[in-house]
Swiss-Prot record:
GO biological process: adherens junction assembly; brain development; cilium assembly; determination of left/right symmetry; embryonic camera-type eye morphogenesis; hindbrain development; negative regulation of DNA-templated transcription; negative regulation of homotypic cell-cell adhesion
Cross-referenced Pfam families: nlz1
Entry superkingdom: Eukaryota
Compositional bias (Low complexity): 113-122, 196-206, 237-250, 272-299
Subunit text: Self-associates. Interacts with nlz2. May interact with Groucho corepressor proteins.
Residue spans, zinc finger C2H2-type: 462-490
Region of interest (Required for interaction with Groucho and hdac2 plays an important role in repression of transcription), ranges: 408-460
Organism of this sequence: Danio rerio
Keyword Transmembrane helix: no
Name used for this protein in its record: Zinc finger protein 703
Chain segments carrying region Disordered: 102-315
Family: Belongs to the Elbow/Noc family.
Amino acid sequence: MSELPPGFAVSPRNQQTFKSHYITNDSSPTCLGLQVDSIASLPYRDPARQEKRLPIRILKMLTAHTSHILHPEYLQPLSSAPVSIELDAKKSPLALLAQTCSQIGKPDPPPSSKLGSLSSSSHGDKDSRSSSSSLKSGEHQNLDDKSSFKPYSKTGSECRKEGAGINSSADKAGFRVPNGSSSSVTCTSLPPHAPSPRASSPQQTSGQSHTHRQSQSPLSQKTAHLQTTHMDSKAAGSDPGNDSSSSGSDRNGKKDSDHNKSSLDVVQIANSSHARASVNSSSASSSSSPQPDSKTDSQPPQPSLGTGHIAPVSPFKPGHSVFPLPSSTMGYHGSIVGAYTGYPSQFVPGLDPAKSSLGMGVPGKHPSSSPLTGASPPSFMQGLCRDPYCLTYPNAPHLGGSNCSSCVHDPSSALKSGFPLMYPTHHLHSLHPSSLSSSATSSLSHPLYTYGFMLPNETLPHACNWVSVGGPCDKRFATSEELLAHLRTHTALPGVDGKLLSGYPSSVSSAASCHLHLPPPSSPGALPSSLSLRGSPGLGLARYHPYGKAHLPGAPSLPMHSLPATAPYYSPYALYSQRLGSASALGYQ
């Protein structure tokens, strides 16, 4: 009563009128409208009309929002069935937004359960769209659903090619993966007029197309597709030891799929995480097949890899860009528990297959790798040791010690100095101090500057990485002495006599120790384990510190040496060597 306008007099008569209008059941807007219409026929100054006047505030409260009352279909909670959201999407943009948000990143249900939910929800509703969508979803598995956003779905042809790669890899290792986990998840049921493209004989093709024509309902169609996929896997696995027959059938399958691409409808498959999971499971189970025969190939050859494989493209080897997916069940010692294994043999040119420590002695194949597989060339990444504390480079075997039993240090690859050392050694790793001077070939095989990639077949292997204001130098030289003489032209100051620099020994090991803040090989504390780009904790102090001294004291095990005569040559390059190395190792040289 205190919120009434000032012109509204409070009297017992008005109180009775107020109670009769707002507290009793006559307070609905329709009753009020009838009473107002009957009173409106009276003259304006009639006392009966004046005493029944209502405040404007209460009238606004009663009549303002009657036209905006929500319909009951919007007040109902959104069900899990996609049809109700589809039907509401025609009327409400909010329902369309809710449908889009609920389907992002969520895998599609299998065709049988989705068909059941569609048919059960469209019993009471005679809308033509719901019935047609239920039929379409049974046959084509969400053929072009424009109201749902599926960013990770693939087309049917890629799915079938991926399935071909899965079946060939699984059957070749002698371990047949169940069809429910590999093919039926990734490739949904085909349309009735499309035969399976991976047929190995014309009779089988006619039988499959006849089976597909006979099956009309989606459930029987899915069963027929499972049968044909099983027949395909049996046909592909009929000769698991012969690689040429499997790859030939895969090529025939690709030709058939290209031929049928015009007649095939686009089949939307499930989320690609399901496809990748099934690929991983099939390749893992094929790699871990318990066969004593070591000649059985665990991965398909390069031509028979399907186009659905996701692989990084290496700029260093343009011909080989598809890496097979690693297996997750091959165990070996070290903390990297078998997560990165199984690269093809063309990435491992110089390793001895007899030194492979796994039971799958595939010729020319080395199972070790590293977590940086996609970021670096495979011919460099294959040689990293599987021991997490032994990260030396096998092409420089003088750096490795005899205590690391898991390294594959092949002396035949010593002269093939492919990609230089990138990983640091652990500071507790025991090495041979005398092995550097034991063989001249091993010391010559190690590159002069251990940053920057050098191609294995490069005629001029030594490149100048000096970066000035005008850009990098990028000149190449055949020997390290020529490169050292060229570097003196960069570092020589105008007022410094060249005789000061001539007394410094110009050999490979001493130059490398100079530019990496290491003692020369003749000093008593020489540690060849420190020849690395990102050094152990003592070498990490040798980076360029703008507010510190030029030479910081290192770890006790790594004594820093002083260069009194060669300071004009030594200090400018040594301060920036770590930064130049990290830039060139990432491909910016």
